[in-house]
């Protein structure tokens, strides 16, 4: 099994959050209050609870706000490094940009605006057992038509990335959490904008020497794209429908958290 202490977490928080304007003019999307805490708090607490210690925040927009809030990470039991993009590099470029700051051979990469209940330890175990080069978290959704789908075979290997369609071949969608071998990250082009979804993954899939697997579950998942998502996500966190170790035991309508 993979010891989580030998895994880096990379959180992509570079986006401007234009769908959330005017909310995001004052703060980057991952810093918006969600159930009384900055949204990113919930993800960082899940990373810490999984036993991962070293976190790299890949930022571009209002980067100083993150460091002012989380500092070196010690309050959360983490060691946080900050890597700032001089210009937006996209999801793939944001991963490639942190390569020099990785401490380990395995990196768990998180899209910073997803609220998820996936079991990170289980996903790591799956990645190790499969001897996978890249593992994507795939979540089953009731109506996949709003999303691009990802098909897998009986062995868990990813077979195709399918654009949005009215007739999806599967209910599995890319849930925005990935595990990469460091060697794969080092192959991503640097210094330019790269999309992990549109460029990196299709290229890896076309390479017979690379094993790309899908870790499939049906846990809580929400892409926090719109103001409505923040309202619903906050309510789900407060009610315990969306799990967050940051809200230790304080469930129901009345709750408090450590200031």
Predicted regions: what they are:
Residues 31, 150-152, 201, 214:
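A structural signal for short hydrophobic beta-strand segments in well-ordered beta-sheet cores
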């Amino acid at each position: 099994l993979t010891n989580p202490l030998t895994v880096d977490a990379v959180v992509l928080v570079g986006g401007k959050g234009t769908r959330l304007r005017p909310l995001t003019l004052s703060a980057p999307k991952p810093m918006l209050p969600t159930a009384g805490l900055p949204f990113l708090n919930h993800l960082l607490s899940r990373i810490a609870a999984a036993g991962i210690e070293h976190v790299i925040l890949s930022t571009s927009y209002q980067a100083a706000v993150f460091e002012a809030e989380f500092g070196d990470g010690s309050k959360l039991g983490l060691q946080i490094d900050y890597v700032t993009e001089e210009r937006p590099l996209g999801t793939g470029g944001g991963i490639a940009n942190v390569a020099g700051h990785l401490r380990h051979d395995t990196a768990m990469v998180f899209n910073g605006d997803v609220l998820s209940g996936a079991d990170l330890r289980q996903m790591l175990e799956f990645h190790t057992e499969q001897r996978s080069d890249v593992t994507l978290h795939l979540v089953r959704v009731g109506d996949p038509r709003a999303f691009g789908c990802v098909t897998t075979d009986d062995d868990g290997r990813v077979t195709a990335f399918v654009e949005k369609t009215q007739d999806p071949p599967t209910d599995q969608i890319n849930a925005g959490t990935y595990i990469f071998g460091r060697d794969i990250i080092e192959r991503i082009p640097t210094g330019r904008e790269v999309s992990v979804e549109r460029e990196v993954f299709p290229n890896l899939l076309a390479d017979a020497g690379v094993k790309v697997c899908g870790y499939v579950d049906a846990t809580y998942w929400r892409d926090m794209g719109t103001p409505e998502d923040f309202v619903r996500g906050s309510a789900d966190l407060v009610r315990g429908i969306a799990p967050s170790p940051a809200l230790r035991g304080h469930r129901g309508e009345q709750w408090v958290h450590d200031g």
